[in-house]
Amino acid sequence: MTALQNDTFLRALRRQPTEYTPLWLMRQAGRYLPEYNATRARAGSFLGLAKNPAYATEVTLQPLDRYPLDAAILFSDILTVPDAMGLGLSFAQGEGPRFAHPLRTEADVQKLAVPDMASLQYVFDAVSEIRRALVQDGRQRVPLIGFSGSPWTLACYMVEGGGSDDFRTVKAMMYGRPDLMHRILEINAQAVTEYLNAQIEAGAQAVMIFDTWGGALADGMYQAFSLAYMRRVLAGLKREHDGQQVPAIVFTKGGGLWLEALADTGADAIGLDWTVNLAEARRRTGGRVALQGNIDPTVLFAPEAAIREQVRGVLDSYAAAGGSDGHVFNLGHGISQFTPPDNVSVLVDEVHRHSRKLRAGQK
């Protein structure tokens, strides 16, 4: 096992003391970076990028070479799992993901099966290659995060056949044929568990479950159709590898109503979107979990002084409820492709600067 130069992120997830608040950014390797766009052009397509371990490694490291971030996250897509199930994933320019074979009928659902993880070997190869590429002067620069979509979020795409404004197709199935919905979710939960465990075996040092569309569910439906299946995944995860604890983060966008329940899933940390007050979230979760988040990504379009002010507000809010440890700074959702890269430098600088001051007892 290669020692880490910077383990601040992992210590924060374990709610241990840190010298400053670590940060990484959702979609930190992405279209806002010109170097990413150059690599994607060489790859020829998004899937050409995501399915090539050398390209995936290259783009994973790009934001780390530009900014002093405290974690790397595997470059991939949440829809690799349903693609491996045979649903026929494609990305049309400017249109987002599409599945050629969405799950619409009972027969479609009956045919669904957990994919052979060998069909996702390109993901695990990328994890291993990124781990090797992170080593500098005999030590690994920062930890590597692996990830998956939640069973419910994957099901949304699998039934709708792509993105949706109202999720009426998947919700109609949920309300009208809950038996079919539960079968999809059971298969997805098993697949996600195996997928994340394979990432851990390949070298992921923390994992995150993205429940992007959990917040589209009504109270009661969320607990039955999203939370229950994330809990099942978490119960099946390898939580130790190479003698090291592997922390797990869960993030339900729009999930502020259910923080107490999320804190009881067995996750080490909860990701929060920008609608949640951090001090209040900390009180509600009772210090049982670390918290990750949660600045509004559009703050990055503001002038420098405003970015710094908003960063301080997030850090101060968390610290007001009992000190700064146990917090990973992040955006409340993925970074916009239109974000000026220089503004990200301002955000990263202010997070590190102000969080050090807070720990030193200064304002």
From Swiss-Prot:
Protein's GO biological process: protoporphyrinogen IX biosynthetic process from glutamate
PROSITE patterns: UROD_1, UROD_2
Signal peptide residue numbers: none
UniProt: substrate binding residues: R27, Q28, A29, G30, R31, D77, Y157, T212, H333
GO cellular component entries: cytosol
InterPro entries named in the record: UROD/MetE-like_sf (IPR038071), Uroporphyrinogen_deCO2ase_HemE (IPR006361), Uroporphyrinogen_deCOase (IPR000257)
EC number: 4.1.1.37
Coiled-coil stretches noted in the UniProt entry, renumbered to this chain: none
Chief localization: cytoplasm
The reaction(s) this protein catalyses: uroporphyrinogen III + 4 H(+) = coproporphyrinogen III + 4 CO2
Pathway the protein takes part in: Porphyrin-containing compound metabolism; protoporphyrin-IX biosynthesis; coproporphyrinogen-III from 5-aminolevulinate: step 4/4
Superkingdom in the source lineage: Bacteria
Annotated compartments: Cytoplasm
Recorded family membership: Belongs to the uroporphyrinogen decarboxylase family.
Complex and partners: Homodimer.
Protein name in the entry: Uroporphyrinogen decarboxylase
Organism whose genome encodes this protein: Cupriavidus necator (strain ATCC 17699 / DSM 428 / KCTC 22496 / NCIMB 10442 / H16 / Stanier 337)
Organism taxonomic ancestry: Bacteria, Pseudomonadati, Pseudomonadota, Betaproteobacteria, Burkholderiales
Originating gene: hemE
